[in-house]
Amino acid sequence: MTILEKNIQALLSGVNEPLGNKLLNFIQNKTCSRFNIDENLNIFDKTHNVFMYENLEEEINFFYQSILEKTPRYPFVCIYGIGNALLIKNLAKHYKHLFVFESEIELFILALSMIDLSEELCSGKIYLVDIKEERVNLQLRILFDQNDMFLWLNVYEMFINHNFYKKYYYEEILNADKIIHENINLVIRNLDPDSKISLSCYENFYKNIPLMLKNIPFKRIIDERKGLFESCIVVCAGPSLQKQIPLLKKYQENFVIFCVDGAYPLLVKHDITPDYVLNLDFEEYPLEFFKEVNPENKTLFILAASTHPSVVDYLYKKQIPLSVTLSDNLPYQNLHINDFGYLEFGTHVGHACYTLAIALKFKNIILIGQDLSFDKQGNSHFDSFDLGSDIDTTLNIPTLKTVAYGGLGEVLTHLAWDDYRKKLEDLFARNSQVNFLNATEGGARIEFTKEINFELCCKKFK
């Protein structure tokens, strides 16, 4: 087995399969046309007619010493450029993790053909990041969210492998640095620094235990219902929902319907009966959404264990079928009450709808009302939303522009929605066995979904 084959095998072992497959596809179908490497491990760039190193040993030693001096006792280091991989190999023994960012597939090929990094790749000591990989954001969020990384994110700095990269890849370095900062900020924003929310959630959970024990165990729901149907619709409460209501009513008998709590009143108003309604809020305001609940409709309410006890108690007294469900977060799993089952609730109720649909083995999950942006009138929700169609404009959350549905220009979103969108993209990317069909026909573009007309969707998957 060649050195390159060993390195690719290490990547394909679960370390970084997308890059492993990309390298394998390259060597099977292409050859290096821009770069080559000589017996002294110096790389020649045919485009700029220049060698990467003028004095290879001296330059590698310079960057080696420079990086070590700036990173005493650092658990990880980020470096742009794989070079000939000698610097990477030498530095790896000093850190728990070494992240190497590169945009040139040929440089990956040449470096991994000459230097055996298979042991470091398999152990996680070296992680190669292909900046052109479609799922690079997902990869970085998973890496940065690890316990031995999270606590040290404040020491992040991008180091450069060699002046060659500074000269010819300056824009790529800036772009990589921007991507890393965005993902670090997203990971940090997930933190609850003063634990107030966490403590409220745990307090609610302890108060909800009696009704959790009296009602349907979530695990039983999954065991009895998974795999029964192929297609479902997840109904969210964005401003685009209003226009989809007539079609939803027409085709409601053809699909299993998952509904976020805030959209429930609109469905009831139009005689649409969802199969599932989900809630995870630790405050009381969702009571506004459930004033018209009817036990005869047989809608099953899936409530997070952290849902406010007043909401749980209200629905229970109304004799509404419900399940108080544990989050898959570690504190709940440590209770070892596995007979009740766990669900990945995420931070937004829509996220819980998708993970429930995934747990029930739906193959086609259709999204409507998932705008994640303001509409042209500045509304954050549909017209008759119980808390006000412009409720998000009062929250003073920083706003930003993002790519619009269909790729047609940009729309105005805010930071919380933008974070949520990225988490959804992570979820969808991790579940590629499911067809996620975005039939919102408005709002922000969500990657790893197929944008499709809602009427066409209904006709195709009914």
Predicted regions and their residues:
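Alpha-helix C-terminal capping segments
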Residues: 93, 265-272, 356-364
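Conserved acidic E/D residue at the C-terminus of a beta-strand in Rossmann-like folds
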Residues: 100-105, 278-281, 303
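Classical protein tyrosine phosphatase
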Residues: 100, 265-279, 377
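N-terminal donor/sugar-recognition subdomains of glycan-related enzymes
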Residues: 1-232, 239-255, 285-298, 309, ...
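Short gly/pro/ser/thr-enriched loop/turn and capping motifs at secondary-structure boundaries
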Residues: 105-110, 264-266, 284-287, 308-310, ...
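Active-site/ligand-binding-proximal alpha/beta "capping" segment
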Residues: 309-368, 372
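Acidic, glycine-rich loop-and-beta core segments that form the ion-binding/anion-interacting portion
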Residues: 260-262, 269-270, 276, 286-287, ...
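Conserved phosphate- and dinucleotide-binding cores of soluble alpha/beta proteins
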Residues: 347, 356-359, 364-405
